Amino acid sequence: ANALYGSGYMPGYLLHTMASSRGSRMPRLTLLDGDSGVALLTPDGLKRPVYHLLSLLEQLGDTVIAQGDMYLAARQSGREDIQVLLYHYDACFDTLFEGGSRVEEQAPFVELMKDHDYNREVTLSVRSMTGRFAIRKYRLTSEEYASRYRDFPLPLADRLSAETLRVLNGTLAPEMSLNLLELDGAYYLTLKLAPFEILLLCFEKL
């Protein structure tokens, strides 16, 4: 099989493919194991990095309110909460994901990465935001999550204590942070995204 399918690069490609189909409604995506949240190590074993993308998409509201070049904003009907999804993907990589499955195809991937290894600078402006908000930030990179444990196979989840399992899944999870802010009409943010990086911002009205 194509080695890219199980890698940390697959979420960026899938998101690019989904975003290419524009619409005013978000498809509902359900995680196979809802109790595990963004955990990659579950009682059924180690899940692939694309599972994290599904967990992020599940947080999007059902109505698309803005969409453009590598960004998407959604809102849940009847609520003031807004979710903004940003990503950095170059369509020149499409043929490597859509082509054959030979391992030799990793060579052109490395060459393309050399030519397109640049950060994308994004300025985000969210208006008509007044009041207290909890802002959750999730950052998903192209890192191969299981690589750090390659020399030590992960044990079955039921062999680990609840605390060890919690910490282990924390090391495998996307980078997460939370800010509590009082907004007076707008929110501005400038940031940089590395190739294949995905960022989800969730604005929750308190």
Regions found by a protein language model. Give the residues of each.
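Aromatic/acidic polysaccharide-binding cleft in carbohydrate-active enzymes
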Residues: 1-105
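A structural motif corresponding to the C-terminal end of an alpha-helix
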Residues: 20-26, 57-62, 125-129, 180-183, ...
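Short, solvent-exposed coil/turn segments
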Residues: 36, 47, 117-119, 182-186
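Generic secondary-structure transition motif, activating predominantly at the C-termini of alpha-helices
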Residues: 45, 55-62, 130, 141-145, ...
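Carbohydrate-binding surface patches
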Residues: 70-153, 195-202
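An alpha-helical appendage that flanks or caps ligand/catalytic pockets
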Residues: 136, 143-174
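C-terminal beta-strand-rich structural cap/linker in extracellular carbohydrate-active enzymes
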Residues: 160-206
